[in-house]
From Swiss-Prot:
Belongs to the MurCDEF family. It catalyses: UDP-N-acetyl-alpha-D-muramoyl-L-alanine + D-glutamate + ATP = UDP-N-acetyl-alpha-D-muramoyl-L-alanyl-D-glutamate + ADP + phosphate + H(+). Its EC number is 6.3.2.9. ATP binds at residues 119-125. It comes from the Bacteria. This is UDP-N-acetylmuramoylalanine--D-glutamate ligase. It comes from Streptococcus pyogenes. SUPFAM superfamilies: MurCD N-terminal domain, MurD-like peptide ligases, catalytic domain, MurD-like peptide ligases, peptide-binding domain. Pathway: Cell wall biogenesis; peptidoglycan biosynthesis. One of its GO terms (molecular function) is ATP binding.
């Protein structure tokens, strides 16, 4: 970590805690700043605030009092989840207090080069794939960012010989100014988080900030399957490396079932460790980063063939009596489940689906359900899921929860079949989040394996 004097004896307000705010507070204190933390959660329910107070950091909890900004703060570090129309943020802007993001703070002190990954879907899987391949190739890749490891915490142990492989959300990117990765990946761009950004154009503009400071000596990896990529590519100073599953490009591409990088065959799509058309795209982006980083083809192929996915994201859980289980609890919409289904033989597949409908058009799923061996349906959207199953002429059973659904699926499955949890719905009708839903699937698998 670079020891910089920019924040020495400067009064800085951290607005919002969570993991990133806590990490930023500790880093700034280490850099000699006079830190105040403000979080809306009450102090007695706020272990992070309690821990910071014990370290001598000033904390104000329970609300965001605008009058706090009457103090003479020289910077604000804003939690990514707090929108720019928040009264505290608006007041800071009116007072011309510079607002920093936690990832930019990490960038200021990083000795290690940064590979930044953003996009609407596939960020976590691609980030993890890239780190795995770099580490397999003898490099030292450190996961950081939106993947659960705050960048301003990871950067404190990173040295010049490391590489920060950083997952970045639109919330994290919208406020950056100086941030400059050496390699950036945009997996894809879809209309999401519009409640935060206001429009798709503003959402894209936030994502596009990842390359704002890049030069021709830096590399920007874009999804050439999307028309928007060609438009955006004309507006960057970075060297663009495209990837595509639909056409041959001057980068990474799929041709006749083989993944290539600039005419060099790397791996067959059927040899990838994770199924699904979206994972071919993720692998192509990873191949581009790996080749730019000097990783040998055989190491890339070996690593991608053994990659088992990320927890809850088309995660290969294991086998019982030659029946394979996949946990795709993160698939909370139709598109995600469609992509998951693309990687399997429907005739040998039992799909567990259903949950809280957030405006899905279930008829869109019907073509992807054709030929399924069986569906196990659950949750608030069960009636709509049943109608889709009927249109696809797929038989189904109902279950009260994921555990019961998994047990039913296992009873129906035969040697060589696959059981896939890919709900196509949110979890909140039955579970606090998709992680808890997926964990129930994993726990049930463990019980079934123990009884087998």
């Amino acid at each position: 970590m670079k020891v910089i004097s920019n924040f020495q004896n400067k009064k800085i307000l951290i607005l919002g805690l969570a993991k990133s705010g806590e990490a930023a507070a500790k880093l700034l204190t280490k850099l000699g700043a006079l830190v105040t933390v403000n979080d809306s959660k009450p102090f007695d329910q706020n272990p992070a605030a309690q821990a910071l107070l014990e370290e001598g950091i000033k904390v104000i909890c329970g609300s965001h009092p605008v009058e706090l900004l009457d103090e003479d703060f020289e910077y604000m570090v804003k939690n990514p989840g707090i929108p720019y129309d928040n009264p505290m943020v608006k007041r800071a802007l009116a007072k011309e207090i510079p607002i920093l993001t936690e990832v930019e703070l990490a960038y200021f002190v990083s000795e290690a080069p940064i590979i930044g990954i953003t996009g609407s879907n596939g960020k976590t899987t691609t980030t993890t794939m890239i780190a795995d391949v770099l580490n397999a190739g003898g490099q030292s890749a450190l996961l950081s960012g939106n993947i659960g490891y705050p960048a301003s915490k990871v950067v404190q142990k990173a040295i010049a010989g490391d590489t920060l492989v950083m997952e970045l959300s639109s919330f994290q990117l919208v406020g950056v100014n100086a941030f400059r990765p050496h390699i950036a990946v945009i997996t894809n761009l879809m209309p999401t988080h519009l409640d935060y950004h206001g429009s798709f154009e503003d959402y894209v503009a936030a994502k596009w900030m990842i390359q704002a400071q890049m030069t021709e000596s830096d590399y920007l990896i874009l999804n050439a399957n999307q028309e928007i990529s060609a438009t955006l590519a004309k507006t960057t100073q970075a060297t663009v490396i495209p990837f595509s599953t639909q056409k041959v490009v001057d980068g990474a591409y799929l041709k006749d079932g083989i993944l290539y990088f600039k005419e060099q065959a790397i791996i067959a799509a059927t040899d990838l460790g994770v199924p699904g058309s979206h994972n071919i795209e993720n692998a192509l982006a990873t191949i581009a980063v790996a080749k730019l980083s000097g990783i040998a083809d055989d190491i890339i192929a070996q690593c991608l063939s053994h990659f088992g996915g990320v927890k809850h994201r088309l995660q290969r859980v294991g086998q019982i009596k030659d029946i394979t289980f996949y946990n795709d609890s993160k698939s909370t919409n139709i598109l995600a489940t469609q992509k998951a289904l693309s990687g399997f033989d429907n005739s040998r597949l039992i799909l567990i689906a259903g949950g809280l409908d957030r405006g899905n058009e279930f008829d869109d799923l019907v073509p992807d359900l054709l030929g399924l061996k069986q569906m196990i349906i659950l949750g608030e959207s069960a009636e709509r899921m049943k109608r889709a199953a009927n249109k696809a002429e797929v038989s189904y059973l109902e279950a009260r929860n994921v555990a019961e659904a998994t047990e039913l699926a296992f009873k129906l499955a035969q040697t060589g079949d696959t059981i896939l949890l890919s709900p196509a719905n949110a979890s909140w009708d039955m579970y606090p989040n998709f992680e808890v839903r997926g964990d129930e699937f994993l726990a049930t698998f463990d019980c079934l394996r123990g009884d087998a």
